[in-house]
Amino acid sequence: MSTTRIPVGGRTELRQRLDEISGSSPEDIALHQGRVKTLSAPCPHSIKYIEDGGGDRSDCMVYALEIPLDLVVTTAIFPNILHEFFTLALSRLLEQMPASEVSEGHVVLYFKDGETKHVGRIQGNRVSSKWGKNPVYKHDISEVPASYGDEYEVLKQPSVRYITNKFIEFARRHPRYVDISDIFDESVIKCGYKS
């Protein structure tokens, strides 16, 4: 894995403040868009609200990679399955892109201490990503909360079928799979994949 450092360029305070305004309660999520907008006075930025992104049932991985929400929600019973796929397996499954070949739809993974913390999609010369349970924003590559880390890499966008199949394989090999196998297999079929 070859990562690139996020350019600092006066973004340290913005990134720290973005961490401070992130919440997880429904009230926090509803107010998040306004908080981001208000930050532009003390910390000028180009972050733009795109959509709510499925609210509190979705996250950056579901948004950027389009893994069916039903599968993610099913594995949320044991968050380690999703967390381990995201932090340990995802970057190894995708093809790294040289900076000169980065284009629309490619995936941006953000890292902290070598662990994947966030994922977004390239749209034009910006990134579109869902910040936890908060809305989807379009932003510069450096305009993300500090907790997402200081390094990133751009990878080729996988097909939805490919990445979903890899997620299913990972979940089925996980030690906790036995605890969710029936409900997970129902979700796999419901989402149009083979059980």
Identify the function of each model-found stretch.
Residues S40-P42, R92-A99, E104-V107, K138, ...:
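Exposed, tryptophan/tyrosine-rich binding patches on extracellular proteins
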Residues G34, G114-E115, P175:
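Intrinsic-disorder/low-complexity loop/linker signature
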Residues T12-E13, V108, S195:
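Polar low-complexity intrinsically disordered regions enriched in Ser/Thr and small residues
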Residues M61-D70, F78-M97, G132-K133, P145-E151, ...:
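Extended interaction regions within the primary functional domain
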Residues V62-Y63, V107, R126, E153:
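Generic structural signal for residues positioned in beta-strands
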Residues Q123-S195:
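Aromatic- and glycine-rich peptidoglycan recognition patches
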Residues P79-V136:
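...with weaker cross-activation on analogous glycine-rich loops/strands in unrelated enzymes
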Residues S2-S91:
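N-terminal capping segments
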